[in-house]
């Protein structure tokens, strides 16, 4: 079980149960859309963000992105990391039928997928020695436009193809994708990847 410094924020108790089997970390549940009307919980999350940092880990469906985007506006950006699980179609064991979009949520993810999502988000694993991070050239909106991933004909289809290739959720906007790409890679590596397509 991996020990993580940051507080992980998930949608519900089943997500929390899954994480408890994978990581040793403080996990806070939002209660789904109830967080929109819970000023005390948002204030609590702000305090946790200031003290330990937060990692937002919501489902990759539309509802998960509505909640994630609400939190992006309610919490200080510099204290919050975004962890994305891939779009994997299926049904959780406890459910009779798949969700509306047919995708597995956090609760249905395998431990290695959750750990990889947390690692890609920049989680601080307290049980490993930190290696100095190499300086990397960030990806900009101008780069996305130059590569045909934003602002042009067919850019949406190219973005979707790249998102699938990188195991990122299909609901990411161009700005959300830019944020995720900068967590995962740098300008040079992405340029190489796009040339290989």
Feature names for model-found ranges:
Residues 44, 62-76, 112, 123-127:
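Phosphate- and other anionic-substrate recognition elements at nucleic-acid/protein interfaces
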Residues 34-35, 57-67:
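Acidic, metal-coordinating catalytic cores used for nucleic-acid/nucleotide bond scission
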Residues 85-134, 138:
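Activity-critical C-terminal alpha-helical subdomain
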């Amino acid at each position: 079980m991996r020990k993580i410094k940051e507080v992980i924020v998930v949608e519900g108790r089943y997500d929390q149960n899954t994480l408890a089997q994978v990581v040793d970390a403080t996990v806070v549940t939002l209660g789904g859309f109830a967080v929109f009307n819970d000023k005390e919980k948002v204030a609590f999350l702000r305090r946790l963000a200031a003290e330990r940092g937060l990692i937002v880990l919501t489902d990759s469906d539309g509802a998960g992105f509505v909640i994630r985007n609400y939190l992006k506006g309610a919490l200080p950006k510099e204290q919050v990391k975004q962890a994305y699980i891939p779009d994997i179609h299926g049904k959780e064991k406890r459910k009779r039928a798949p969700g509306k979009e047919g995708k597995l949520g956090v609760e249905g993810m395998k431990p290695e997928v959750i750990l990889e999502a947390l690692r890609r988000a920049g989680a601080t694993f307290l049980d490993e020695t930190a290696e100095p991070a190499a300086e990397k050239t960030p990806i900009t909106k101008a780069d996305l436009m130059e590569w045909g991933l934003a602002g042009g004909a067919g850019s949406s289809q190219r973005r979707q193809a790249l998102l699938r290739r990188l195991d990122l959720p299909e609901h990411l906007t161009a700005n959300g994708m830019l944020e995720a790409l900068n967590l995962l890679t740098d300008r040079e590596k992405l340029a190489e990847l796009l040339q290989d397509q």
